Structures are given as structure tokens and as C-alpha cells.
From Swiss-Prot:
Residues 135-255 form the Peptidase C6 domain. This is Genome polyprotein 2. It comes from Barley yellow mosaic virus (strain Japanese II-1). The active site is at C143 (for helper component proteinase activity), H215 (for helper component proteinase activity). Keywords: Hydrolase, Protease, Thiol protease.
């Protein structure tokens, strides 16, 4: 699309016929700045008149042609004859009334202004061509864009980028058919930002006689009998409007008639309101009263009430061309949404009760259920709508009335407050009238609100701190009592344990010596053999002593269950470990408090707790946190150094890491992505390959995550296949089902996949819907309207695609935030588990150390205190959380 222009100056000082030929001299063409030119190309593609559209007429408010360009041409008589219209409708000359003469002038003596020249547009005050585009015309309602074309040639190099952004936003801000006052405010804004455009010429702005309708002329000339405004430049236009701000002409629209009143920003996401059921509170109570008049002890009466409940409400209450009703006469005229799931559940419950046998429910029971339905508006006031509430909640604007957004929001809040205060009284009145005073609703206690206005700030004395001191002293006394009782409990355990001498010695020398008989004393005290040296690669933990190992454990004391745990760890079967860990942890907790070698039991309990969390994360989410894996490997090295054996194929931590890397579910997710990116036969081929892989993997042993991936992948591919093969008349529910399944798939498996086939179907459906709304019309004028509607539908389609892309971006941001939260949880959970178990073992180990019989009381060295963390901790404050969940800047 080339942006060509014409520049040929003729300054005659009046509207008289020029003394010089208009087309005798060659024209000179100016070139816009590169950024401005590219912006105009984008605006032209969106808002140009279609090449096959009828560009020779302007429609009036009645939908009929009100004028034709090139009025002095040879086609005018034929045009009037074809329309069978009176000649007064398309007359060429017209007297300029007094009310319009303040802005407009009579130009009947200058017939060349009404001729099409296919070269340029004219300026009004001086007959000279204006720089404008000549290869196309703007669509109906966007002719005002021609005013800003001459301004583009006056912009300096420094302001080129700013003016480009101004042009890019201009059609979206003003929309189609703006008022003359809106054009005036836009010009003032442009002058403020770009002072160099003040002297720029503008094309003629013409007004239709007797109608508040304006048109910015182009190369087609002026419509017949229309009056040009008394301005030919930006400066004269602003001065003319400024001197007549009180004129009613400023409310006139610039452009031809629109396509009727409608919700401006209605999109496909609002279409569900068309089929939703609504009912006013008055009609609901009236219907329920009629139901209560029926004999509910008979089957016929119950069937009649059932039919009444099934027919409640109306549909098609609101749509794009039909505004939500505005007859608001108290709370009884509010509309209740019956299609809501909460309301539907209550209605279904009553309907089921009506369909049951007569013996199950008496008539009084059914009357109570029906009376309870009268409280639906009071229990669900959030789905009660007035016009203000409906338009505010759905962000809808009627017929480009964007200036009413603030008042709609304010009035919606007023309606909400009124509903919350009056719905309870309506329900009480309904119950009293329908039950003849037998039932009563408990009235809420009124809350008196007082407002105190202080002329001066209230002076208050210094607060007393004695109550804080008293709380501190009481807390200290209670803590001392608890500590004293706990120490007494530990002493009682020591005395009791030392009185028993029933456990034999268990040597760990490594020789083949058999244990001594029960009556003899051991040859040497139990402990670690000096010939057993820990490897250098073992990571030592300062919270455990060197004598806490498997060789120091009395297996007779520990019992068979602990031996089974040791055997399970040696076998390394993750499924068996996952089932045995909860019971083993409870046994280990008992052994920590009542058996010798409690340090080793604490270490095993720590390992099993961390391993259980890791196995659960692996089976459910196919996830293995690096922090959890490192913690498991550290404890495994310590347990291996203390005599616990693991499977030769690898430790449980190694098996989990290998399982994550070779996950069947992850492989299927990648295959699904490859299938979703394809279309046509490639999609079907890749889908068949994926389904074959799923059928082969079903025979193997799978985790819960793998099974979930298989089920979701099979269901998603089946839904997409159904949407591709179904008839176009039944496409909408199947396409919505497939898109919903794809969204659930992305949420479950932390992906952001999109289906090329579904996007193509959605675009095709929107295009077919737009073409279906166009239809066929018998006249050329209606064809122009149809083409205009197609252009509007295409514009709506582009905006919906942009909205869909914005939704995808927001979902990606939500996935990123979720991954960050999961990462923080995976890091903190194993650390907290390790700290809690280790601190419990260290706290309880003090009483279990004295259980060994026959040992003299010697002063034992003070063990190193257990510390869960050695460095400065991270503070999880609201500031950090706010930084994590802060909305990214766009």
C-alpha cells in the first residue's frame, strides 16, 4: 500500500473558480518520515474501504442512501431513477440555515467542490489541493482519519516516533463515528504535543443539511448540497470550534450512519449470556406462590409443580444488539441468574423430591422446600443483576458510551448496597405471605452505625506497661514448672532403666568369636572395633556419635520389624519402601526413646522420612528436587559407613533420579507436543504414533504420574480428533471441549502447549460466523453494508486473537509463578523434615544414653550441640513474597 500524495498550491483567496488549470502542471510528491509512513500503512490495512465496496454513496440514519459523490456527474439521474427516490432527497443545492451558518458556509456557487477528481482533496478557505492519499478511501465512520494526513508532512524528525504512536492509537481511542467535539479535543491534544502542525491545512469538513452528520472529504469531492465548514487549517478549525463551544452541532457524528446500537466491546466470551436463564425476584415469588396453591399430596399436583419449576426463567434477555433491561423499580425487579450452578443444585434437589414416590415426602415437607426456594435471591445476591451491575461486572459499554464507565461503576455499587439491605426483608415477607404466618424467618439484628466527627485530635495518656510485665512473669513461671516436671520425668526413666539388666552384650570386633554366655562378663565393652575405619568420602554429621551404627544396635531389642526395614532398604524396591515407611517411622520413634543406639535410629528415621517424601513426589509428580536428592545421598553415605547395606544396582536416591530421567510420562508429553504442533495428515500420523506408544506402555508397571499422563493424553487427542471430524453445525461444543482439555493438560503438567489444529478451527468458525451474519441483499447499497459488516467482523476477529494471545501470556506467567512456588516448597520441605527429626532425636537422646547395664558412671564429654542450620537464615517476609508474586511489567 503506497502512501502517495499530491501537492499543488493555488491560493485565490476565495471559493471562486480558479484562474489556473488544476491539472496543467506536473504535481510534486512529498514523502513522509519512515516511521509515520509504516504506521499509516498499518492503519490503512485496518480501516480502508474494501476495494469491491460501493464507494459512491453515504448512508443516512434510516439506512437508505442520503447522498452520492460526484453529484454533477452524468450518473446522478440514473442513480435517482434506480433508487426510485424523490429528487428532493438528493438535491444538489440547499440553503444554509441560520443555526448551521455559524460553522458552515454555502458553496453552491463552487460546483467543482462536488466533483470527483481522483487526484486530491481541497481546503475550504483557500482553493488549494491538500496532501492526502488518493489510492483508496477510508471505511464508513473513519473518514476523520483524512484530517491527520496533511499533519503527517509537517512533523519534525524529532517527533516522528511520538506522532507514529499517536496515529497508531487514534482509531482505537476514537472508534467509528466520533462526535465533532471528540475530533476537536483530539486536535487540541495534537497541537499541545506537536506545535508544528498548527498551520497545517486540512481537507474540507462537510455537514449534511438538517442532520447532525459530518463528513471529511477526500478525492471523491463533497456530497451534494452539503455545506463546507469555515475552516481550512488546524488553526482555523480549533478557533472556529472554540468560539462556538455552546453549539449543538458539536454533538454531530463524523462519518455516515453506523450499524445500529450495540454493545461496543461484546466478544465471544459474552455469548453464554444469550442462553442463560434469568428471572425477576417478583416473578420467582409469584411462581412459587402458585406452586404452593397446588395439592402436593397428589401425584398430579407434584407433576404440575415440577413442570412449573422446569419452565422458570427466560433466555435471550441480553445479547450484542439487545441491552440488559433497565426497569429498576426496587429489589423485586432485580434479575436472578438461574443458570448458575449453585442455584441449579437447589432447584434440582426440589425437582428430585417431587419425582420421588408419595410416601417419601409429605406435602408439608415439599411446601417447606418450595418456600425455601424463595430465599435464592437473598442467599445468592452476588448473582442478582441490574443493568449497572451486569455491565460493570462484564466490562461492557453500550454504543461507544465510554464516558459512562465511571457512572456505571458508581451506580453498580449503589445497587449492590441496596440489594444486600433489602433481600432479607423480601424473603421474610414472602415466607409470611406464602405460609399464612406458619413459618417465620429470623430477622437479623440491626447494627447501629455512628459517625463521630472530632474537631480536635483526641489526646490519650501514655499506655501502661504493667500488664505486659505481668504476662512476662507468668510465662516465665509456667516455663520453669514445665522444665522441672520434664527433668523429673527423665530421672524416673533413668532409675527404671538402670534397675534392669536383661540385654546381652553384642560384640563388633569383626572376628569369629561367639558371644559370651549369659553369666559371664564381656571381654571388652561394646563399641566400634578399632580396625574399622570410615572412608574419607563419607560426609560426617556432627549431630551423631561414632558409636551409633548398625553394629551397636541390639537386634533382639529392636525386633523383627526393624530387621524388615533394613532388608527393604537393601533390596531397594521403591514401591515396597513407600508402603512400609509410615509404619517403620512409628516403630523408630519408639526405639529412639526406649532403646540403646538411639542415634542410629534417629539417622534411619531421618532417612526414611526424607525418602518417603521423595518417593511420593516421584510417583505423583515425576519430580526429584536437587536439594532432596543431595540430602538423601548425604544420609546414605553416613548409613553405609555405619554398616547399612544398599542394593548393588544403586541406592534409592539413584533409583529415583534414574526414574525421573527415564519417565514414560515425560516422553509422552514430548510426543504430545509434537502432535499438537502439526496439522492435517501430519497431526493424524503423529497422533497415531502417540497412541501406539501409549498402548505399548500400558502393559508395563507405571507410576501414578505416568498413568495420569496416559489418561489425559488419550482424552485430549480423542477430543481434538472429534472436533476435526464433526460436522460444522455441531463444531462449537466439541471445539470448546478440546480447548478446555488442552488448558487442563497445560495446568496439570506445567506446559504451555497450543494446538495448531484447534487454532485453525477457531479462526475458521469465527470467519464462518461473520460470513453467516452478512447474508445476501438485493441492492448495491446493502452489499456495501454487508462488506462493511465483514470488515467489522474481521476487525473483531483480530481483537479476539489479540485477547487470546494475552490470555496465553497470563497463563504462562501463572505457570512461572507456580514453578517458583514449587521450587521453594521442594527446597524448604526436606530441610524442615531433617531439622525436626534431628532435633527430636538430639532432645530425646539424653535419657536413652544411660540404659547400658554395668557401665560405671564416668564423666562423658559434652557432645557438640545439634544445629539444623549453620549460616544466616533467609527471611520470608511479605516483601520477598510480594517480589515473587508481583505482576510482571508489560
Amino acid at each position: 500500500m503506497s502512501a502517495s500524495s499530491s501537492r499543488q498550491l493555488f491560493d485565490c483567496g476565495s471559493l471562486d473558480w480558479p484562474n489556473k488549470s488544476l491539472f496543467g502542471d506536473p504535481t510534486t510528491r512529498d514523502v513522509m518520515h519512515e516511521h509515520i509512513s509504516s504506521t499509516w500503512n498499518a492503519v490503512i490495512r485496518r480501516h480502508m474501504l474494501a476495494p469491491n465496496a460501493d464507494a459512491e454513496t453515504i448512508l443516512g440514519r434510516d439506512g437508505l442512501p442520503s447522498a452520492q459523490f460526484d453529484a454533477y456527474g452524468a450518473m446522478l439521474p440514473s442513480f435517482i431513477q434506480a433508487l426510485n427516490a424523490p429528487t428532493t432527497r438528493l438535491r444538489i443545492t440547499h440553503r444554509c440555515p441560520t443555526a448551521e451558518s455559524i460553522l458552515c458556509a454555502d458553496a453552491s456557487h463552487a460546483p467543482w467542490l462536488y466533483m470527483a477528481n481522483n487526484v486530491c482533496a481541497y481546503e475550504a478557505t483557500h482553493l488549494k489541493p491538500v496532501q492526502t492519499f488518493i489510492a483508496f478511501d477510508f471505511a464508513h465512520g473513519y473518514c476523520y482519519l483524512s484530517l491527520f494526513i496533511p499533519l503527517s508532512f509537517r512533523i519534525t524528525f524529532e517527533n516522528a516516533r511520538s506522532f507514529s504512536r499517536f496515529l497508531e492509537q487514534l482509531p482505537d481511542i476514537l472508534g467509528a463515528y466520533p462526535t465533532l467535539a471528540a475530533i476537536y479535543k483530539t486536535m487540541l491534544f495534537a497541537i499541545r504535543l506537536f506545535p508544528e502542525v498548527l498551520q497545517a491545512p486540512i481537507p474540507i469538513i462537510a455537514k449534511r443539511p438538517g442532520v447532525l452528520q459530518f463528513h471529511v472529504s477526500d478525492a471523491r469531492g463533497l456530497p451534494p448540497s452539503w455545506f463546507p465548514m469555515k475552516c481550512g487549517s488546524v488553526r482555523s478549525f480549533v478557533a472556529l470550534i472554540t468560539n462556538n463551544l455552546n453549539s449543538d452541532l458539536l454533538d454531530g457524528i463524523v462519518g455516515s450512519n453506523g450499524d445500529g446500537e450495540h454493545y461496543t466491546n461484546w466478544n465471544s466470551g459474552h455469548d453464554h449470556w444469550i442462553v442463560n436463564r434469568f428471572i425477576t425476584v417478583r416473578d420467582l415469588h409469584s411462581s412459587l406462590k402458585s406452586a404452593l396453591d397446588v395439592d402436593l399430596d397428589t401425584e398430579g399436583g407434584r407433576n404440575a409443580v415440577l413442570d412449573l419449576l422446569l419452565d422458570l426463567g427466560v433466555t435471550n434477555l441480553v445479547r450484542r444488539e439487545k441491552r440488559f433491561p433497565a426497569h429498576f423499580q426496587g429489589a423485586e425487579s432485580v434479575y436472578l441468574l438461574l443458570s448458575c450452578e449453585r442455584v441449579g443444585n437447589e432447584l434440582v434437589a426440589v425437582q428430585d423430591a417431587l419425582q420421588e414416590p408419595l410416601a417419601n415426602h409429605s406435602g408439608l415437607d415439599l411446601r417447606a422446600l418450595i418456600i425455601n426456594l424463595g430465599g435464592l435471591p437473598s442467599r445468592h445476591s452476588d448473582i442478582c443483576y441490574t443493568r449497572n451491575i451486569f455491565e460493570n461486572d462484564n466490562h461492557l459499554v453500550w454504543n461507544f458510551e465510554f464516558y459512562r464507565i465511571a457512572s456505571i461503576t458508581r451506580n453498580a455499587q449503589i445497587d449492590r448496597d441496596m440489594l444486600s439491605s433489602s433481600m432479607a426483608n423480601l424473603f421474610s415477607n414472602f415466607v409470611s405471605e406464602s405460609s399464612n404466618g406458619q413459618y417465620r424467618v429470623k430477622e437479623p439484628r440491626p447494627i447501629a452505625q455512628y459517625r463521630v466527627e472530632h474537631d480536635e485530635p483526641v489526646a490519650s495518656g501514655a499506655p501502661s506497661a504493667w500488664w505486659q510485665v505481668l504476662i512476662g512473669i507468668t510465662t516465665a513461671i509456667l516455663g520453669a514448672i514445665i522444665f522441672f516436671l520434664w527433668r523429673c520425668f527423665l530421672r524416673a526413666k533413668r532409675v527404671k532403666f538402670q534397675a534392669k539388666d536383661s540385654f546381652p552384650w553384642f560384640t563388633t570386633s569383626g572376628d569369629d568369636d561367639s558371644p559370651p554366655p549369659p553369666g559371664d562378663s564381656p571381654s571388652h565393652p561394646p563399641g566400634r572395633s578399632p580396625d574399622r575405619v570410615l572412608p574419607r568420602t563419607v560426609v560426617r554429621d556432627l549431630s551423631f556419635n561414632d558409636d551409633d551404627d548398625l553394629h551397636s544396635v541390639d537386634l533382639d531389642e529392636a525386633g523383627s520389624r526393624f530387621g524388615e526395614v533394613v532388608s527393604l532398604i537393601a533390596r531397594g524396591n521403591l514401591r515396597e519402601l513407600a508402603g512400609a515407611i509410615p509404619e517403620s517411622l512409628s516403630n523408630l520413634t519408639l526405639l529412639q526413646t526406649s532403646a540403646s543406639g538411639s542415634g542410629f535410629y534417629t539417622m534411619v528415621a531421618l532417612y526414611l522420612a526424607t525418602l518417603g517424601d521423595a518417593i511420593t513426589a516421584f510417583h505423583e509428580h515425576n519430580d526429584a528436587s536437587p536439594t532432596t536428592t543431595q540430602s538423601l545421598r548425604t544420609v546414605e553415605l553416613q548409613l553405609e559407613a555405619r554398616g547399612l547395606r544398599f542394593n548393588e544396582a544403586g541406592t534409592p536416591a539413584n533409583l529415583i533420579q534414574r526414574g525421573v530421567n527415564s519417565s514414560v510420562g515425560r516422553a509422552l508429553v514430548r510426543l504430545t507436543q509434537s502432535a499438537l504442533l502439526a496439522t492435517g495428515e501430519k497431526f493424524r500420523t503423529r497422533m497415531a504414533t502417540t497412541l501406539e506408544r501409549i498402548a505399548a506402555e500400558r502393559l508395563n508397571t507405571l507410576t501414578a504420574y505416568d498413568q495420569r499422563v496416559i489418561e489425559m493424553t488419550t482424552e485430549l487427542l480423542a477430543a481434538i480428533k472429534t472436533a476435526l471430524e464433526v460436522e460444522r453445525s455441531e463444531l462449537t461444543p466439541h471445539l470448546a471441549n478440546a480447548e478446555a482439555l488442552l488448558q487442563v493438560y497445560n495446568n496439570l503438567f506445567s506446559t504451555d502447549y497450543a494446538s495448531a489444529s484447534l487454532l485453525a478451527l477457531r479462526r475458521e468458525m469465527i470467519l464462518r460466523s461473520a460470513e453467516g451474519r452478512v447474508g445476501e441483499q438485493p441492492t448495491s447499497a446493502s452489499d456495501a453494508a454487508n462488506e462493511e459488516l465483514v470488515q467489522r467482523s474481521m476487525t473483531k476477529l483480530d481483537k479476539e486473537i489479540e485477547l487470546f494471545q494475552a490470555q496465553i501470556d497470563s497463563q504462562r506467567r501463572a505457570v512461572t509463578i507456580t514453578e517458583a512456588s514449587n521450587l521453594r516448597e521442594n527446597i524448604l520441605q526436606p530441610i524442615n523434615t531433617v531439622a525436626n527429626i534431628a532435633m527430636a532425636g538430639a532432645f530425646l537422646r539424653g535419657g536413652a544414653r544411660h540404659r547400658m547395664p554395668g557401665m560405671p558412671d564416668v564423666a562423658a564429654p559434652m557432645p557438640n550441640p545439634f544445629r539444623a542450620f549453620s549460616g544466616r537464615g533467609h527471611s520470608l517476609t511479605t516483601t520477598r513474597s510480594g517480589g515473587l508474586f508481583r505482576r510482571p511489567r508489560v
